[in-house]
Curated annotation (Swiss-Prot):
It is an enzyme of class 4 (lyase). Heterodimer of a large membrane-associated beta subunit and a small pyruvoyl-containing alpha subunit. This is Phosphatidylserine decarboxylase proenzyme. One of its GO terms (cellular component) is plasma membrane. Its cofactor is pyruvate. Keywords: Cell membrane, Decarboxylase, Lipid biosynthesis, Lipid metabolism, Lyase, Membrane, Phospholipid biosynthesis, Phospholipid metabolism, Pyruvate, Zymogen. It comes from Dinoroseobacter shibae (strain DSM 16493 / NCIMB 14021 / DFL 12). Its EC number is 4.1.1.65. The record marks G187, S188 as: Cleavage (non-hydrolytic). It is a peripheral membrane protein.
Amino acid sequence: MRMTDTFIKPMHPEGRKFVAIFGAIALALFIVWEPLGWIGVGATVWCYYFFRDPERVTPQRDGLVISPADGVVSLIEQAVPPAELGMADTPLTRVSVFMNVFNCHVNRTPVPGTVKAVAYRPGKFLNASLDKASEDNERNSICVEMADGRQIAMVQIAGLVARRIVSFVKGGETLAAGERFGLIRFGSRVDVYLPQGVQPLVSVGQTMVAGETVLAELGAGGRAA
């Protein structure tokens, strides 16, 4: 591996226009006052870093639920999935992963399966680390059905700084575990609703790596009727 590969990561195409804008502002600031220009360069480098999209090595063993986001587990609780997905109104274990502005913000599919529903709902822009952000904030919800009929939901939630949720998938698509399904710009949160009876293998405060960290194990039981 080259040394540059350690420090320079691929950038997601969604970030190109933002890096271009930051770069143009940096050039303009150099004309005004050189120290301001260097601040602009720093901001441009940060923007590039924010939109980095490194490759991830996703565990391939059957029955694993993989973290959909980089960040820290902020909440683990029982909650009903978003009504707009049309899932059962039974409370499920919800694991929330909070992403700050320094985390990679490309989101990855936790399990292989077929997209059954994608639903966007406008809302507020509260601090994404708050419990009520799941209900009140702008969100994009995705339901994936696995081969055994069980379903899992991923919910992208906007936050104080994040004001744009981007989804790459639509209903009927087949996804592989670890496949990119979206991103959220500039700080946010992703909730995962586990199938009935499945318990998380992570705890609050644990650091997660999207597409790599095992969040839960489905096990042999609990198959859909």
